[in-house]
Every structure is written in structure tokens, then in C-alpha cells.
């Protein structure tokens, strides 16, 4: 096996729903990554039990346990699937060891990355942030509109099955809205962004649904729709269950109160309705909100590994 074919080792912090799904995705799908460690704090968690059964090295002593693992030096990339508060401590502990970090929490310590929009912009950073599930689903649409015409205001509503929201998601609700709103502006290109999350208690659970509302001025409506459709196709390359739920709507703002959400001159409202069905690698298909996060993080981790490999070869 040559250096160009040896998988790069990663560690996953957080043995909950997101961390476990990410582990299984890497094991099943990736040819360039290898799970060198699954890190948790609950020795009885299902994620650590599954990792043990699959032959993945584990520790239930958190980041301190990871640092003590015999293969720690060989780990190149650490993916953090804990919580916003925990990530700050994890980053502080690991930074001295020069490990690259992919943050799946709303902590937003490092620059935002949405693979279909700005993959190459931040890969050199030692810590990148995957925004939120709602951000990964909707920011590409805002960016697609921004590529054609300025977006004065963009609002997203992410509706996810309550059953798919674990303790970490529920603890991070405030950070979810703040981080997603900032990323709508910084990555999506909107002058003003707003984010809303809904935990839908319906039974049986419904798959993730997302609505994007954008206020724009005069523009080529066909070009806007074409840009959106192309972006949906780009996201679907790494999240196969990502799709338009219904036709794209562009309506004049005459008499619509949403026109008061911005002081800028706007003439039309763009409405985009999406749904995200999960791949059901570990979680049920309705948990598209978690699937889009782990799929996007896998995409970024593989890009980081490829970047490091190309640098080593050069």
C-alpha cells in the first residue's frame, strides 16, 4: 500500500446519534478515511457499544481519554459531535497537538463550511464549523439566489421530527438560530438572515422539511430558478435524499407584509420548499436533519484528507 492509498485516521468525539451515524458512514462509504477512535463519556452508550462491535478503538473518558490512546499521534482529523459548550473545551485541549477539527456543533469557533457553496475557502483552517442541519439544508439555496441577484433578507424555517432531536440538539436550540442566521449572511450572501427551528412531534415522524424565503429586487426569474435547481443537484451529490418538495415560487411583493422586513428596495419574494430524507445508515430515514450534517462533514473530512495528501506528495 502506497502513501497515496493509506486512509487518513479520524477521531469522532460524541457517541450519540450524530457521532454514531458519522462513524458508520465513514466505515461504509469512505475509501480515504479510517475511524481511529470513537470518543464518549458514557461507557454504556449505544455508540460506544457499536464501535466496539465494529472493531473501532473507543474511550469513555472524553478528550483526555483520546489523548491517552496509543494511536492518538496517527489521528489527523477530529470531528466533534458533542455540544457548543463542550466543543470550546475540546478545541482548547486538542489545539496544542495540531489536530484539524471539524465542528458539528453550533459553537462556530472556526469559519463556516457548506460543501456545495464554499468548500475550498476554509480547508486550511485548523477548525471549521458545519453550521447546523438547517444551515446545511438552506444556505445553499440562499447562495444560489445570491449568485444571480442581491438578497436583502433571507429567512429559513427548519422543521425536524422531535424524535430525531437528542439532548445535544435540544440544548443547542438558541445557538442553532444564532449560528444559522450568521451563516445565512456570511456564506449565503444575504444582507440580513433569520433562522427558525421547529421540533415536530407528529407520529409517525415526518422527514425534515425546510422553507427558504428570500426578498429580492428586479431580476431574471428564470435565472434564479435555474441557479436554485443546479444547487439542489450539487447538494444531492453528497446528500441523496435532498430534493425540492414543490415548485419554486417567485411572487411580487405588492401588499405582502414581508416587504417590511427590510428597508432596502425589494420587489419579489422567492419561496423554496425542500425535504431531506436520511440514508438510514444508522438513524431512521426521517432523520434527514442528522443525515445532512454527517454527510456534509464526511465530504469536508475527505477534502481535508485529500488536501493533506496532495501537500505531502508535493
Swiss-Prot record:
Its EC number is 1.2.1.10. SMART domains: Semialdhyde_dh (SM00859). NAD(+) binds at residues 15-18, 164-172, 289. The active site is at 133 (acyl-thioester intermediate). It comes from the Bacteria. GO terms for biological process: catabolic process. It catalyses: acetaldehyde + NAD(+) + CoA = acetyl-CoA + NADH + H(+). GO terms for molecular function: acetaldehyde dehydrogenase (acetylating) activity; NAD binding. CDD domains: ALDH_C. The keyword Protein biosynthesis does not apply. It holds the Pfam family AcetDehyd-dimer. InterPro entries: Acetaldehyde_dehydrogenase, Acetylaldehyde_DH_C, NAD(P)-bd_dom_sf, Semialdehyde_DH_NAD-bd. Gene3D superfamilies: Dihydrodipicolinate Reductase, domain 2, NAD(P)-binding Rossmann-like Domain. It is an enzyme of class 1 (oxidoreductase). Keywords: Aromatic hydrocarbons catabolism, NAD, Oxidoreductase. Belongs to the acetaldehyde dehydrogenase family. This is Acetaldehyde dehydrogenase 2. It comes from Nocardioides sp. (strain ATCC BAA-499 / JS614). The lineage of its organism: Bacteria, Bacillati, Actinomycetota, Actinomycetes, Propionibacteriales.
Amino acid at each position: 500500500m502506497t502513501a497515496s492509498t493509506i486512509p487518513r485516521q479520524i477521531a469522532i468525539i460524541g457517541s450519540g446519534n450524530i457521532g454514531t451515524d458519522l462513524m458508520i458512514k465513514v466505515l461504509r462509504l469512505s475509501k480515504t478515511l479510517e475511524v481511529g477512535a470513537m470518543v464518549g463519556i458514557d461507557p454504556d452508550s449505544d455508540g460506544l457499544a457499536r464501535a466496539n462491535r465494529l472493531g473501532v478503538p473507543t474511550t469513555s473518558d472524553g478528550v483526555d481519554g483520546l489523548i491517552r490512546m496509543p494511536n492518538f499521534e496517527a489521528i489527523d482529523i477530529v470531528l466533534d459531535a458533542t455540544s457548543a459548550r463542550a466543543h470550546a473545551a475540546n478545541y482548547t485541549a486538542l489545539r496544542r497537538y495540531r489536530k484539524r477539527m471539524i465542528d458539528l456543533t453550533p459553537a462556530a469557533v472556526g469559519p463556516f463550511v457548506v460543501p456545495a457553496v464554499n468548500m475550498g475557502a476554509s480547508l486550511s483552517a485548523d477548525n471549521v464549523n458545519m453550521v447546523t442541519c438547517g444551515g446545511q439544508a438552506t444556505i445553499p439555496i440562499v447562495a444560489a439566489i445570491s449568485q444571480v441577484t442581491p438578497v436583502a433578507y433571507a429567512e429559513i424555517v427548519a422543521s425536524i421530527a422531535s424524535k430525531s432531536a437528542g439532548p445535544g440538539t435540544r440544548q443547542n436550540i438558541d445557538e442553532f438560530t444564532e449560528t444559522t442566521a450568521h451563516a445565512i449572511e456570511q456564506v449565503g450572501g444575504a444582507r440580513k438572515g433569520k433562522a427558525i427551528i421547529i421540533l415536530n412531534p407528529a407520529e409517525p415522524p415526518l422527514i425534515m422539511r425546510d422553507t427558504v424565503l428570500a426578498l429580492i429586487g428586479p431580476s431574471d426569474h428564470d435565472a434564479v430558478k435555474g441557479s436554485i435547481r443546479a444547487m439542489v443537484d450539487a447538494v444531492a451529490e453528497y446528500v441523496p435524499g435532498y430534493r425540492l418538495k414543490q415548485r419554486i415560487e417567485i411572487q411580487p411583493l405588492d401588499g405582502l407584509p414581508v416587504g417590511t422586513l427590510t428597508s432596502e428596495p425589494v420587489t419579489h419574494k422567492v419561496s423554496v420548499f425542500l425535504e431531506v430524507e436520511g440514508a438510514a445508515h444508522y438513524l431512521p430515514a426521517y432523520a434527514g436533519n442528522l443525515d445532512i450534517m454527517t454527510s456534509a462533514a464526511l465530504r469536508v473530512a475527505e477534502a481535508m484528507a485529500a488536501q493533506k495528501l496532495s501537500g505531502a506528495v508535493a
